[in-house]
Amino acid sequence: MGGRMPLLNVSPLKWPISLKIPAMTVCVAVLSCTTVATFAGITSVATTRSLIEKHLNYVAISMRDALLTKLQATKFEVEGLSANPGLLQLFNNTSVGFAAVSPTDLTAASVDKVESGKFSLAATPTTKFYVDNYQKLDAWLKPLAAKQSYSGILLANAEGAIIYSTGTNPVGPVDANGSINLAIASSANSQEAVMTDFTPPTLSAPGQALYAVAIVHPFIPDKRNGTLLISMSTEMLNAVMGQAKGFGPHSEALIAGSDGKPRSLSSISRDEDAEAVVNSDLLSQGIKTSNFGAQEVLSASQQLKWQDHQWSIIALEPEADVVSASTAMLIKIIGITAATAILALAMAILASRSISGPLAGLVSIMKRLANGDINVRVAGVDRRDEMGEMSRAVLVFRDNAIARVAAEDDARSAEEAMEHDRRMMEMERSERLDEQARVMAQIGGGLAALSDGVFSRPITVDFPEEYRPLKSDFNRALGQLRETIRTVAAQAASMSSIVSEISCATDVLAKRTEHQAIVLDGAVNTMDAISNDVSVTANAANNADALVRDAHSAAAASDEIVSSAIAGMLEIEESSAKIATIVSVIEEIAHQTNLLALNAGVEASRAGEAGKGFAVVASEVRALAQRSSDAAKEIKDLINVSTQRVERGKELVDSASELLKHIAARVDLIRTTVSNIAATATSQAKHLSEFQTTIAEIDQSTQQTAAMAEESDAACRSLNAEAQHLLELIQQFELGGGSSTRQPQSPPTQRYFMSR
């Protein structure tokens, strides 16, 4: 104690590190933890409350969605069951059997069902069919109701009477104002399942709701045969709401109707004597604080609309649980703050000792190094903190001191070795310069001969070992260059010979092509003349074809005229026959008139004086009849003559008609022949024109070929000149080995002749 008392009179900034670091760490930790604890205390209640509100809202939404899913699934199950063919058949059979049962038997069976829950109708001849089908429905629907947690499954016929139930409901007519009859009436005009609202539950009995859906006739789809009713208990709602999990042990979720009455039981408010009612402010959607039962609660409400019903899904958390959660959070924060301060103090003490101890050791080591002790051992170089960095820095100082002493010794030894090496290198450099001079002289001589075009002087002097690859490469390059020049010379001579032959052949080709062009030009002129003659022939044939067509048309017209004349003569002949008939009638009339006049004269002579006048008239009539008869004979004779002449004319016209038809047939044959001649002449003219065009194109192509042959000949001459120039250049080189680069004699020119 006595050693540390003077620190009370010293500024904390001048305290040793072993005291300064723990003191500063504790102060910072206490200040930070106090600030955090204060802020956490202020915000913990609000944060906890916000989390609980969000969780309650999530619970309300989850419960709403779960209940909606359950209601939809139940609706689909009810509708699917109502459309089941097996149920339709059993329902129809049960309805038929129910109609045959007497009211007395139904009453007795209903009493037993209400008391014992069992259907005990005796199977008589009139009830057997109903009982059998009832038992079949029992075997199917009771397990289904238990599996789906239904309170009961009921079947009502078209008159609204219950014909089957899985529970204790009696069979027979129902109360007109009861829930079953209301459910049947609500589904009367709907194709879907209709649900009634849940009745509020009590502690002694759960509430009920009914799903009702029409059952159609099995043979008449548009006819309603009855109703399927599914009874659901509020126990289903309790099971769904029981899944809600809040923050506290007393949190829960419940369902309330628009009338404020709960549809599920609550653990917060249980009053069997008084009817529980939910405050109206809890029914509206949102998060709020209100009273429920005898407690103040935090609630979140969500609205659920299902068919015609409006419900509120309310998640509740007692306010006491909310406050207790905030208090527990604050206590945890204070405990964490205190533990943090204590831990910070312990860590500060350990940190200060871990720093002050190694620092004292480093100070001692640095003092020894300053006194020239380079064999000192540096501790702490393996540490990964700042003390390790400082230890490694001191180690560097020690190593530098050791290296400085060793460097002084090495410098003296290196200076002596460098002097010896310098003298040896001077001697080797002088010898290498002499060898390089000899090698460069040989290579220079070879390159000088190469520049003069001499390729037959390789290097034969021996080179030192390191320069022998240079000699080998030079001699190999010289040999390859010599062989290349020889090959080029041979190829140039061969190319000159080939070009000469091509030039001669091209010259002959040009002359032949020129001769062909002259011949083709004459052929073109001849074809022009032939084409003109054929065109004239075609035109003449076309004119003849037109004339023959006119003659054919005239012959056809003459034939028509002759036909008309024959028809006219036939009409004249017919008219003559009719006139002859009329003349015969006139002769008959004249003969009869003459007989009448004769009879009249006889009668007049018998009459005496009184008939004289009548006798005169009869005489005149007889004379007139005689003249008519004579005239009729003359006309008949004339008609006979005319008929004979018409017959003769008709024969002549027929002969002329046959002759004209023969002429027309010959003219038609001539027309066809002339048309064929004209078509053939036209086709020949067209083909000659095309052939003339082809000949002209051949002539043009031949002229182009002649021009190309002249160009090829000029190119061959130019190439031959280049080959000669190349041979002259190659002759400047001396290849050695008896080879000569003089231009070889050209082979005899080979003439190429083209067959005509």
Swiss-Prot record:
Residues 491-720 form the Methyl-accepting transducer domain. GO terms for biological process: chemotaxis; signal transduction. It comes from Sinorhizobium fredii (strain NBRC 101917 / NGR234). Chemotactic-signal transducers respond to changes in the concentration of attractants and repellents in the environment, transduce a signal from the outside to the inside of the cell, and facilitate sensory adaptation through the variation of the level of methylation. Attractants increase the level of methylation while repellents decrease the level of methylation. This is Probable chemoreceptor y4sI. It is found in: Cell membrane. The chain crosses the membrane at residues 26-46, 330-350. It is a multi-pass membrane protein. Residues 353-406, 434-486 form the HAMP domain. Keywords: Cell membrane, Chemotaxis, Membrane, Methylation, Plasmid, Repeat, Transducer, Transmembrane, Transmembrane helix. It holds the Pfam family MCPsignal. Belongs to the methyl-accepting chemotaxis (MCP) protein family. GO terms for cellular component: plasma membrane. Residues 736-756 are annotated as: Disordered. The lineage of its organism: Bacteria, Pseudomonadati, Pseudomonadota, Alphaproteobacteria, Hyphomicrobiales. GO terms for molecular function: transmembrane signaling receptor activity.
